[in-house]
Amino acid sequence: GVNHTNFIKKMWYQRSLSIPSDWNSKKILLHFGAVDYTAEIYIDGRLISVHHGGSSPFSIDISHITKPGSTHNLVVSVSDDIHSGLQASGKQSHQPNSFACFYTRVTGIWQTVWMEAISPYGLKSAETYPNIDQNQLVITPQFYQIANDQTLEITIYDDQKKIAQLTSKCANGDKLILPIKKMKLWSPETPFLYDITYQVKNAEGQVIDEVKSYVGMRKVHIANGMFYLNNEPYFQRLVMHQGYYPEGIWTAPSDEALKNDISLSKAAGFNGARLHQKVFEERFHYWADKLGFITWEEFPSWGMSSYAELASRNFLSEWMEVMERDRD
């Protein structure tokens, strides 16, 4: 946010947006990690997008209204009224001061904003499903566009050693199966992660897009009233994490602060956390994967009127965006 904790119903951001000259023929995306609450995005005075939801990410394709080698005027208008009953505000106080379990308010851009240039035929997403019972990883890719004879090559590494590879013709929604021999499981005690490289290639075999990621092979299910991890009963010792920071309220002061939250929790004997009434930054989940930490994510649903249809619409659409971001 803007480090101003009063009730702010309207605010504006403005800055110049310089497009590198070597971004010709690229799809240019403008990403917002989270803006509380309704964001209107303008470029050169033209409204190009509106997003409702203070905790979910959104991206805008600005290729058609920007020009490589030029500078544009970017304006973000934010509306935030936690008294309306139409928006989820979590533990933000509806009174001037904090009280009970309601704390300092957040308004405006509170997560990372960045711009990137990608191939128009690049990989849009890849949903991973670890099937430890069959010793395999199932990957479902989506692409921005698909050209004739375009292929996707997926390579899985165990500590820089190639252990599986698959090449397939690009198709949205295909389920691609890679066998994992001598599989290493992920758990809080042994948080092993496999590295994955995705390469999209054109008809000539040239790499037009490359994405590097990771995956943990693990299974979670409930049976006989018990929680199971990797087919074994598992006792969760969870801390309740509210994600408030003196320096930035909802915004962590640094990546190290997010990592330290998990390190301190594990040192105290906890193996996971209930993330209470807040959608945490993606980097928090990254460190949870790397360090071995179970997370139960909870939407900041407080503040909505149960009688307002618009509040339900706002909640459901935003929650789906959060689920899409954190589904793996």
Give residue spans per PLM region.
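Accessory beta-strand-rich segments of carbohydrate-active enzymes
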Residues: 3-122, 146, 279-282, 293-296
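Intrinsic-disorder/low-complexity, polar/charged segments enriched in Ser/Thr/Lys/Arg/Asp/Glu/Gln
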Residues: 10-18, 27-29, 57, 71-73, ...
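Short strand-turn-strand beta-turns centered on an Asx-Gly dipeptide
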Residues: 42-48, 157-159, 230
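Short hydrophobic beta-strand segments in globular cytosolic domains
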Residues: 48-49, 163, 234
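Short catalytic-loop micro-motif centered on adjacent basic/acidic residues
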Residues: 49, 187, 271-275
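Active-site mouth of glycoside hydrolases
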Residues: 55-63, 83-88, 93-94, 103, ...
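Extended acidic/polar, glycine-enriched regions
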Residues: 67-71, 142-223
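Surface beta-strand/loop "capping" patches
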Residues: 117-147
